[in-house]
């Protein structure tokens, strides 16, 4: 399998942002600062993201969102797959270029 190319220097990314509660019309594509991997963390360049019923439920129900710790403005989506593009200090299980999948509370729909 061909190893994906990795750009570890990205400072900006695009992300779907939830800025108020409601239906799909409240979602906006925004250019945002790319997070940096801290100690013990990795950063993933998302190549695919899925939306499940809980994602949609939290966009329209402030009480549920609050129970899950969601604060506005927020990212959107919990399921993702992508490529590790940055590795923080102390991380030994992953390396830049590794293909990964997982879940992240309301931050999956981004690049």
What is each of the regions a protein language model found here?
Residues 54-60:
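Cytochrome P450 core scaffold surrounding the K-helix E-X-X-R motif
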Residues 11, 25-30, 42, 80:
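Short beta-strand or tight-loop elements
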Residues 110-111:
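A short glycine-rich beta-alpha junction/loop motif
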């Amino acid at each position: 399998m061909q190893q994906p190319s990795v750009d570890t220097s990205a400072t900006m990314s695009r992300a779907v942002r939830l800025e108020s509660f409601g239906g799909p019309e409240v979602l906006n594509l925004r250019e945002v600062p790319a997070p940096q991997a801290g100690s013990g963390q990795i950063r993933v360049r998302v190549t695919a993201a899925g939306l499940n019923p809980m994602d949609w439920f939290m966009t329209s129900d402030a009480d549920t969102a609050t129970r899950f710790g969601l604060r506005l403005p927020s990212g959107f989506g919990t399921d993702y797959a992508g490529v590790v593009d940055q590795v923080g200090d102390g991380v030994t299980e992953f390396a830049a270029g590794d293909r990964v999948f997982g879940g992240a509370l309301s931050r999956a729909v981004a690049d």
